[in-house]
């Protein structure tokens, strides 16, 4: 018998009565809120075929082989399993489909900001008729929930995948896309300038690109972006961002920051992306965005939009804000 049999493996933990009660309260608060907005719950298995799940975060999946020799994996997020369910079993229902979940997910990478290998996600996904107003309303719904959960000093960062895509095409950086995306995810602007240098860009262009991708703020930075980017994809993305920002402000969501470097670290996003932050946590509470191609893999070509929040992260941020 192992000497540490009384201990837990790294990346998992127990929740004692006080914290367990808070987790249950926050989960119930989410379920009640989204159910009132017409969302219906879907429950999926904790593990599926590896090939089904690899689209989302291949390197982080916990994989294993069962007794029949099948390669399986624990789900690393809920968007891909939900996409599979609605594509294969629900696509003939009235659109838009509005789905919610409160489910445990798993990660093989628990370094850096991912401290846990097992954690709970609270999320919603909408499939079908995705309009700019619907996207805005879902971001507002996330903000309303986090306010009700008593998350202090909430900030919501908004970005768009096609800002980076347009920039890469305009400045002919195709061969460096993965490097650029990784540097942006790490907010490593020194590495970013090095990538531009290896791509043969002049010092003036390098400095201009890095300065642009560091921009975070209100609507004023959109004007600067429109002057710098001429690629049709980027210009359309900026127009969409402006439309969503104006609508959210008119609806009382003022915790907004535009962030041109926001790309998120999942592979399937195709449009608007966003993340929720608080100064009481050193990483996002959660986030989401638009994904129009993921469902094609399962035989249904339809747009989708959603978000997921980390329950443990919400609890941690609340505890940190009380301590301070």
Curated annotation (Swiss-Prot):
Q: Which PANTHER family match?
A: HISTIDINE--TRNA LIGASE, MITOCHONDRIAL-RELATED (PTHR43707:SF1), HISTIDYL-TRNA SYNTHETASE (PTHR43707)
Q: Which GO terms describe its molecular function?
A: catalytic activity, acting on a protein; histidine-tRNA ligase activity; transferase activity
- Identify one Gene Ontology CC term for this UniProt entry: cytoplasm
Sorted alphabetically, the keyword list is: Amino-acid biosynthesis, Cytoplasm, Histidine biosynthesis
What GO biological process terms are annotated to this protein in UniProt? histidyl-tRNA aminoacylation; L-histidine biosynthetic process
Record-given protein name: ATP phosphoribosyltransferase regulatory subunit
Q: Which organism is it from?
A: Carboxydothermus hydrogenoformans (strain ATCC BAA-161 / DSM 6008 / Z-2901)
List the Gene3D superfamilies hit by this protein, alphabetically. Answer: Bira Bifunctional Protein, Domain 2
């Amino acid at each position: 018998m192992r000497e540490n049999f009384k201990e837990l493996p790294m990346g998992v933990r127990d929740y004692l009565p006080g914290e367990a009660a808070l987790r249950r309260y926050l989960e119930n608060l989410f379920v009640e809120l989204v159910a009132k907005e017409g969302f219906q719950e879907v429950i999926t298995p904790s593990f599926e075929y590896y090939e089904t799940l690899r689209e989302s975060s291949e390197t982080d999946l916990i994989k294993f082989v069962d007794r029949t020799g099948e390669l399986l994996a624990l789900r690393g997020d809920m968007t891909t399993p939900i996409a599979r369910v609605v594509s294969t079993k629900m696509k003939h229902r009235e659109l838009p489909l509005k789905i919610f979940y409160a489910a445990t997910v798993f990660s093989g990478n628990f370094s850096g900001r991912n401290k846990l290998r097992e954690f709970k996600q609270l999320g919603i996904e909408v499939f079908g008729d995705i309009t700019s107003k619907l996207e805005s309303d879902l971001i507002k719904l996330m903000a309303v929930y986090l306010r009700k959960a008593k998350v202090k000093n909430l900030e919501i960062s908004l970005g768009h995948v096609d800002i980076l895509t347009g920039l890469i095409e305009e400045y002919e950086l195709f061969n460096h896309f993965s490097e650029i995306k990784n540097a942006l995810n790490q907010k490593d602007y020194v590495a970013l300038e090095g990538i531009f240098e290896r791509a043969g860009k002049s010092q003036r262009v390098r400095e201009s690109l890095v300065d642009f991708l560091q921009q975070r703020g209100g609507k004023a930075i959109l004007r600067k972006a429109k002057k710098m980017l001429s690629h049709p994809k980027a210009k359309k993305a900026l127009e969409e961002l402006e439309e969503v920002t104006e609508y959210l402000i008119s609806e009382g969501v003022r915790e907004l920051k535009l962030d041109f470097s926001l790309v998120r670290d999942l592979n399937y996003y195709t449009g608007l992306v966003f993340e929720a932050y608080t100064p009481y946590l050193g990483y996002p509470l959660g986030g989401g965005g638009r994904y129009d191609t993921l469902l094609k893999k399962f035989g249904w070509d339809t747009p989708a939009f959603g978000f997921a929040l980390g329950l443990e992260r919400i609890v941690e941020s609340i505890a940190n804000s009380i301590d301070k």
